[in-house]
Amino acid sequence: VQGGDWGATISKWMAELYPDHCIGIHLNMIIAWPPVDKDPLENTSQEEQKLMANYEKYKEQGVGYYEIQKTKPQTLGYGLNDSPVGLAAWIVEKFYGWFDGEENKLVVSNDEVLAIVSLYWFSESITSSTRLYKENGDLGFSFENIKQPMAGAVFERDLIAPPRAWAEEIYNVVQWNTHKGGHFAALEQPESLSADIIDFIKKLNIV
């Protein structure tokens, strides 16, 4: 399985719940926290500590959307589902802030942005997508160890970029690479992401 953002959480659940059917897990947003009984900076490099600073900035300036979607998704949904401009503003703001681009500059085309906004608008699915934060967020994150091989593709400007030592507390890490790019890796750096996935598949000897 492969995933980033919510896909990373879902991928972990799949690996945990269906170990006989999931032979490997590749993540491009690795969710991991420091071990409670160790120095959180133990076995971390200076470069990894620098990447961790992105998360601190995100916590200070970027989690407003998360708190709203986690606590009042239905209220938010009425407004976004009623206004294409409001919906576009809610989504496009993330594209500006979460890509590895210069300030106030998109790194994907307007056509790609409009296609994504249109997906939510014409299907009227923005409300159900925000409810995901409420309905699944209440469950919390599972810290059960994953025995299947795991590959981490860390993109330097992602919202969460924990050090490998943290990930190894939960996952069976067999591959760990750092790439240029931000949160939406598949849009921004498709070549880097796909090459990382292919390298992992080769390690699993399934092709």
Regions found by a protein language model. Give the residues of each.
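The feature captures the conserved acid-bearing segment of alpha/beta-hydrolase catalytic domains
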Residues: 41-72, 142-145, 168
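Generic detector of intrinsically disordered, low-complexity, polar/charged segments
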Residues: 1-4, 21, 61, 76, ...
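C-terminal subdomain of alpha/beta-hydrolase-fold enzymes, centered on the catalytic histidine
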Residues: 69-207
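Conserved hydrolase catalytic core segment
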Residues: 1-50
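Extended alpha-helical regions
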Residues: 11, 28, 55, 61-62, ...
